[in-house]
């Protein structure tokens, strides 16, 4: 009787160990995926920042060209 109880206990302990091992493997996979996603987010943020800077530069260039065009148009009106 005690031997059967011991075998059942041993089986439950082994099952718990197997479950823990699987969960640890899943945790490692999720950590790797999380790291990968974090890198993707960082890259996306860097790309966004670059695009914002480029957009600002293009807006400034557009303003310069608009001022030049206004100047030329005002000179044409004077003629």
From Swiss-Prot:
One of its GO terms (cellular component) is cytoplasm. Keywords: Cell cycle, Cell division, Coiled coil, Cytoplasm, Septation. It holds the Pfam family ZapB. The keyword Coiled coil applies. One of its GO terms (biological process) is FtsZ-dependent cytokinesis. It is found in: Cytoplasm. Gene3D superfamilies: 1.20.5.340. InterPro entries: Cell_div_ZapB. Residues 4-78 form a coiled coil. Non-essential, abundant cell division factor that is required for proper Z-ring formation. It is recruited early to the divisome by direct interaction with FtsZ, stimulating Z-ring assembly and thereby promoting cell division earlier in the cell cycle. Its recruitment to the Z-ring requires functional FtsA or ZipA. Homodimer. The ends of the coiled-coil dimer bind to each other, forming polymers. Interacts with FtsZ. Belongs to the ZapB family. This is Cell division protein ZapB. It comes from Sodalis glossinidius (strain morsitans).
